[in-house]
């Protein structure tokens, strides 16, 4: 998978800034296959792992009927895979009984101006905010409060996906020792990577002012993180 890698001084070298921007890209579905994939026209704005939504027009209005993620790019075209749109998975909102079809509009890089932020300490948190002034970062206390309520001091992909859905965020930013990444919050594909410096100290499970993120005996998958970097690196493993 193609990634954008930037080498930065200090931890992030934010004195000269760190640019990251993937503009929203709209294009119609050209063809839809029986295996749950479809073809669209490619664009430099989209990367493998970029996600978005499918819009279907009902008379004068349009509605989201599915999620999509980019799975391949070749010869001026890109293949996308359909998924259930998370925000529609509510018992009071029936799922639309409409399958994506040719002519429906795909909106990729959806909500890519909003991101969760996972960093090991307050100083790095403040650096990141200063480096990406055009990114709307969801305050880590919101994620911390969710994990505290769920007794999950070891957040998983699904935990972050839920928080992205609840916060209307399309990205997750994670700072680790030696590298930091922006990734799609649903596919967890790394979209941009920064080579960074050494982390001097860690707050677990990440920097937040919520202090009571603890375990509970009846949750077998709940345990404290011993190694911050190993835990978050695992989230981005291809087979995870």
Regions found by a protein language model. Give the residues of each.
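Sec-dependent N-terminal signal peptides
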Residues: 4-14
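Surface-exposed, polar/charged interaction patches used for macromolecular assembly or partner binding
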Residues: 17-240
């Amino acid at each position: 998978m193609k990634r954008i890698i930037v080498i930065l001084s200090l931890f992030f070298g934010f004195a000269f800034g760190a640019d990251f921007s993937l503009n929203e890209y709209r294009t119609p579905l050209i063809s839809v296959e029986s295996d749950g994939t479809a073809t669209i026209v490619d664009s430099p704005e989209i990367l493998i792992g970029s996600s978005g939504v499918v819009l279907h027009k009902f008379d004068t209005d349009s509605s989201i009927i599915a999620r999509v993620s980019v799975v391949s790019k070749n010869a001026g075209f890109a293949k996308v895979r359909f998924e259930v749109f998370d925000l529609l998975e509510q018992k009071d909102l029936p799922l639309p009984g409409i399958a994506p079809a040719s002519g429906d509009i795909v909106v990729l890089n959806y909500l890519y101006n909003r991101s969760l932020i996972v960093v090991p300490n307050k100083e790095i948190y403040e650096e990141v905010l200063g480096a990406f002034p055009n990114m709307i970062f969801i305050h880590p206390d919101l994620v911390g409060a969710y994990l505290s309520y769920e007794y999950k001091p070891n957040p998983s992909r699904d935990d972050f996906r839920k928080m992205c859905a609840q916060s209307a965020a399309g990205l997750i930013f994670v700072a680790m020792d030696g590298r930091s990444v922006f990734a799609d919050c649903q596919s967890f594909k790394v979209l941009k990577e920064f080579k960074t410096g050494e982390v001097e100290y860690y707050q677990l499970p990440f920097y937040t002012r919520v202090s009571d993120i603890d375990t509970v005996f009846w949750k077998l998958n709940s345990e404290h993180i011993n190694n911050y970097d190993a835990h978050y690196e695992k989230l981005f493993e291809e087979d995870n």
